[in-house]
Amino acid sequence: SIGSGKYAEGYQAIFEALDECCGNHAQWVIQQWQWNTNQAKSLTAVPAGRLIVLDLFSDGNPQFDRFDGYRPQCAVYCAIPNFGGRTGFFGRLPKMADNYFAYKAKYSSVRGVGAAPEAIEQTPAVYDFLFELPWMGSKPDVDRWMHEYASARYGASAARAGSAADKAWNTLLHTALDNTTTLQGPHEAVLCARPSLHVGSVSTWGGSHIFYDTQRLTGAAWDLLAAYDDVKASASPVAMANYANDLVDITRQVLTDYGKSLLEGIATASADTLSTPVFQRRRDAFLGLILDLDRLLGTNRIFRLGNWTETARRAATEIQGYDAATQDWMELDNARTLITTWGDEGPCEQGGLRDYSYREWEGMLRDFYYPRWKYWFDHGMNAPQGGWFATEWNWAHETGLPVGANVKGETGKAAQRRFYSPQPEGDSYT
C-alpha cells in the first residue's frame, strides 16, 4: 500500500513496473474518487499523457476545476447513474449536456465519457444520452434529443410530435431526469425504509427529498398510459416491451412518491392518537399501497425479485461440483443479503450499509418491506426490542423465524425456501 504523503513516489514506482511489463505504449487508467491534494500529486509522477483519470461522479459532483482538468494527463467525464442498485427513475440529462461540453471547451485534457454505475437496469435513457455525447459536435438541444429518443423507443408514429408519448417524455426530461444536486442516485422510497414517522433516507448516504413537482410526473404517467394504442399500432414487439417497462417504472415512481405524502399524513395524524379514524385510514392506505405496488411490479420481469434470485441460483451451477446447498448459498448468503443487510451485523449496523442496495421489486415489497411496516404499526410504532437486523437477516437467510424475532436463526433447508418466480403475472397496462 501507499503510505500517507508518499503518493507521488508510489505512483511513480507502479508506473515504472507497468512500463517494464507492458512497454512504453501502455496507459494507466485510474479512478478519481474523493481525492485529496496529496493524491493529486500522482498526476505529475507519471509522464504526461500516460495516465487516464476517470472523474467518476462528473454528472453529480465534477472535480475538473479542482484539479485543473487533471492536466497534464487525460481525463474522462463519467457518470454514476446509480448507487447500490437502489430503485428509482432518475437522471441529470440537461446538466450532463451543459457540463460535458463546458469542460471540453475549458480543458483540452477532457476526452470522452464513461459510466461507473454500481448496478444497471435503471433508467436506460441516461445511458443512451451519455454515450451519444462524444458523437455530438456541440451541446445538443436536449428537448429535441428526447423527442428522437421516444421515437426510437416506441416508433416514429407512436411518438410523433405532440403525441401522448412525446409529451410524456418531455415532461420526464424536465422533472425526474433534470436533477441538479449532488444526490447519490435517485431520491429514496420511504416504503422501503426501516419504519419511522420521519424518513430522511432509506440508506445511510441517500435522501428522500423529492426534487421535482410530483403533479407533473403524475401527468407524464397519464400521458404514457394514453400512448398505449399508438405504441400497439406500431406492431413492434420491441416497442411494446420498451413501453411496458417504462409504463411500470414511471407508474411505480408516481406511487412511490405518493407513499411519501401518505407517511407525512400519518405523522400529522399520529400527533393526536393512534386510534383516530384518520390515522387508521392513512395507515391502511400506506400498507395497501405497498401491496398494490407489489402487484404492479409483478407484471414485469425486470421488477421481480425472482429475476434476481433465480439468476443467482443459475450462476451457482457454474461452480464445479455444485449442489442445492451451493445454490442456496448463492441466493441467500449473496443475492438476498446484498439487497437487505449487505452483510452480517457489523457492515449492516456499524458500517451503515443496511438497505444500501434496497430494491423496490415484487416479492420484496410483499414479503420484506410490508411485514416490517406492519409489525411497526401493530406494535405502537416501535421496532423489535433487539432492533431490525435479526428480522432482516432471518428473511434473507430463510430461517423461518417471524418478524420481530430477536435472534438470528440458521439458514433454512432448500425444501423450505420460498420460491420467487421470475415470470411476469398479469398485464402492465390493464
What are these regions (language model features)?
Residues 1-160, 166-168, 173-178, 192-219, ...:
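Catalytic-core regions of glycoside hydrolase
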Residues 358-430:
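Extended, compositionally biased alpha-helical segments that mediate assembly or anchoring
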Residues 1-11, 237, 241-264, 273, ...:
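Aromatic-lined, polymer-binding surfaces characteristic
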Residues 231-247, 296-314:
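Short, solvent-exposed, charged loop/turn and helix-capping segments
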Residues 231, 235, 269-277, 380, ...:
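Secondary-structure edge/capping motif, primarily at the C-terminal ends of alpha-helices
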Residues 164-170, 183-194, 238-247:
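Short coil/turn segments at secondary-structure boundaries
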Residues 212-235, 249-271:
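C-terminal substrate/ligand-recognition segments
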Residues 4, 156, 163, 186, ...:
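Intrinsically disordered, low-complexity regions
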